Amino acid sequence: MGDYIVVLEAPIVVKDVESVEEAIEKAVNKVVSALEREKLDFVRVELGYSQCPVCGAHFESAFVVGNVGLVGIYLTLKVFNAQSLEHAERIAKAVVGKALKKVPLKLFEIKELHNGREGGGITFEEEYQG
Protein backbone atom coordinates (compact mmCIF):
# COMPACT_ATOMS: atom_id res chain seq x y z
CA MET A 1 0.00 0.00 0.00
CA GLY A 2 1.34 3.37 -0.97
CA ASP A 3 0.51 7.04 -0.74
CA TYR A 4 0.42 9.18 -3.87
CA ILE A 5 0.01 12.74 -5.08
CA VAL A 6 -2.35 12.69 -8.05
CA VAL A 7 -2.85 15.60 -10.45
CA LEU A 8 -5.90 15.42 -12.67
CA GLU A 9 -6.61 17.68 -15.63
CA ALA A 10 -10.16 18.91 -16.25
CA PRO A 11 -11.62 21.02 -19.09
CA ILE A 12 -14.16 23.50 -17.73
CA VAL A 13 -16.62 25.26 -20.06
CA VAL A 14 -18.00 28.64 -18.96
CA LYS A 15 -20.57 30.75 -20.79
CA ASP A 16 -21.23 34.48 -21.08
CA VAL A 17 -17.64 35.62 -20.67
CA GLU A 18 -15.99 38.58 -22.35
CA SER A 19 -12.32 37.91 -21.61
CA VAL A 20 -9.84 35.17 -20.74
CA GLU A 21 -9.51 36.59 -17.21
CA GLU A 22 -13.27 36.40 -16.70
CA ALA A 23 -13.33 32.82 -18.05
CA ILE A 24 -10.56 31.80 -15.63
CA GLU A 25 -12.32 33.40 -12.67
CA LYS A 26 -15.67 31.78 -13.49
CA ALA A 27 -14.11 28.36 -14.12
CA VAL A 28 -12.12 28.35 -10.88
CA ASN A 29 -15.17 29.53 -8.90
CA LYS A 30 -17.31 26.85 -10.55
CA VAL A 31 -14.85 24.08 -9.64
CA VAL A 32 -14.22 25.32 -6.09
CA SER A 33 -17.97 25.60 -5.42
CA ALA A 34 -18.59 22.06 -6.70
CA LEU A 35 -15.75 20.68 -4.56
CA GLU A 36 -16.95 22.54 -1.46
CA ARG A 37 -20.50 21.16 -1.89
CA GLU A 38 -19.03 17.65 -1.62
CA LYS A 39 -16.73 18.68 1.27
CA LEU A 40 -13.63 18.15 -0.88
CA ASP A 41 -11.76 21.22 0.33
CA PHE A 42 -8.51 19.20 0.43
CA VAL A 43 -8.34 19.20 -3.40
CA ARG A 44 -6.04 21.95 -4.68
CA VAL A 45 -7.35 23.83 -7.73
CA GLU A 46 -4.87 25.44 -10.13
CA LEU A 47 -4.99 26.93 -13.59
CA GLY A 48 -3.62 24.61 -16.25
CA TYR A 49 -0.84 25.53 -18.64
CA SER A 50 -0.25 24.58 -22.25
CA GLN A 51 2.93 24.62 -24.28
CA CYS A 52 3.31 26.31 -27.66
CA PRO A 53 4.28 23.64 -30.22
CA VAL A 54 6.41 26.16 -32.14
CA CYS A 55 8.41 28.07 -29.52
CA GLY A 56 7.89 25.89 -26.44
CA ALA A 57 6.66 28.79 -24.29
CA HIS A 58 4.04 28.04 -21.63
CA PHE A 59 0.75 29.93 -21.50
CA GLU A 60 -2.48 29.71 -19.51
CA SER A 61 -4.89 27.05 -20.79
CA ALA A 62 -7.80 29.40 -21.27
CA PHE A 63 -9.51 30.34 -24.51
CA VAL A 64 -12.58 32.42 -25.30
CA VAL A 65 -14.54 32.20 -28.56
CA GLY A 66 -17.99 33.70 -29.01
CA ASN A 67 -18.45 34.47 -25.30
CA VAL A 68 -17.78 30.83 -24.37
CA GLY A 69 -14.61 29.96 -22.49
CA LEU A 70 -12.68 26.72 -22.19
CA VAL A 71 -10.32 26.62 -19.22
CA GLY A 72 -7.92 23.84 -18.31
CA ILE A 73 -7.81 23.21 -14.56
CA TYR A 74 -5.40 21.02 -12.55
CA LEU A 75 -6.83 19.26 -9.49
CA THR A 76 -4.26 17.94 -7.02
CA LEU A 77 -4.95 15.59 -4.12
CA LYS A 78 -3.20 13.03 -1.95
CA VAL A 79 -4.40 9.45 -2.13
CA PHE A 80 -3.52 7.20 0.81
CA ASN A 81 -3.20 3.40 0.97
CA ALA A 82 -3.57 2.74 -2.75
CA GLN A 83 -2.44 -0.64 -4.05
CA SER A 84 -0.79 0.76 -7.21
CA LEU A 85 -0.45 3.83 -9.42
CA GLU A 86 -3.55 2.77 -11.34
CA HIS A 87 -5.50 2.26 -8.13
CA ALA A 88 -4.51 5.74 -6.90
CA GLU A 89 -5.66 7.21 -10.23
CA ARG A 90 -9.04 5.45 -9.98
CA ILE A 91 -9.52 6.63 -6.39
CA ALA A 92 -8.68 10.24 -7.31
CA LYS A 93 -11.05 10.21 -10.29
CA ALA A 94 -13.84 8.72 -8.17
CA VAL A 95 -13.38 11.30 -5.41
CA VAL A 96 -13.21 14.34 -7.71
CA GLY A 97 -15.81 12.86 -10.06
CA LYS A 98 -18.41 13.06 -7.26
CA ALA A 99 -18.23 16.84 -7.46
CA LEU A 100 -17.54 17.29 -11.17
CA LYS A 101 -20.02 14.74 -12.49
CA LYS A 102 -20.04 15.57 -16.21
CA VAL A 103 -16.44 16.73 -16.54
CA PRO A 104 -13.97 14.34 -18.15
CA LEU A 105 -10.95 13.87 -15.90
CA LYS A 106 -7.56 12.89 -17.28
CA LEU A 107 -4.47 11.91 -15.33
CA PHE A 108 -1.83 14.62 -15.71
CA GLU A 109 0.76 13.46 -13.18
CA ILE A 110 1.16 11.00 -10.33
CA LYS A 111 3.98 10.63 -7.80
CA GLU A 112 4.47 8.17 -4.99
CA LEU A 113 5.13 9.58 -1.52
CA HIS A 114 7.81 8.07 0.68
CA ASN A 115 7.61 8.97 4.40
CA GLY A 116 5.28 11.87 3.59
CA ARG A 117 7.60 13.25 0.90
CA GLU A 118 7.61 12.87 -2.85
CA GLY A 119 9.69 9.95 -4.00
CA GLY A 120 11.86 9.70 -7.01
CA GLY A 121 15.05 8.05 -5.90
CA ILE A 122 17.83 8.66 -3.47
CA THR A 123 19.73 11.94 -3.32
CA PHE A 124 23.51 12.14 -3.21
CA GLU A 125 23.53 13.38 0.41
CA GLU A 126 21.34 10.51 1.60
CA GLU A 127 23.51 7.99 -0.21
CA TYR A 128 26.74 9.50 1.14
CA GLN A 129 25.53 9.53 4.78
CA GLY A 130 24.73 5.93 4.28
UniProtKB/Swiss-Prot annotation:
Pfam families noted in UniProt: DUF555
Domain of life of the native organism: Archaea
Family matches, as InterPro entries: UPF0212
NCBIfam families: PRK03922.1
Family of the protein in this entry: Belongs to the UPF0212 family.
PANTHER family documented for this protein: UPF0212 PROTEIN MJ0068 (PTHR42199), UPF0212 PROTEIN TK1194 (PTHR42199:SF1)
Name of the protein in its database record: UPF0212 protein PF1486
